[in-house]
Amino acid sequence: MKKQRNPHLISKNYKGIPIGFNLNLNRTAIKRIQDTREK
């Protein structure tokens, strides 16, 4: 696999979410987590 453009979206675990296999799903999940954190 080539290196992706967005290194912190790819193959890292964010709170147990494997990031990179489904960017749309993960973006939503991350946004939700960030929203929860801000509240």
Swiss-Prot record:
It comes from the Eukaryota. This is Putative uncharacterized protein DDB_G0291876. It comes from Dictyostelium discoideum (Social amoeba).
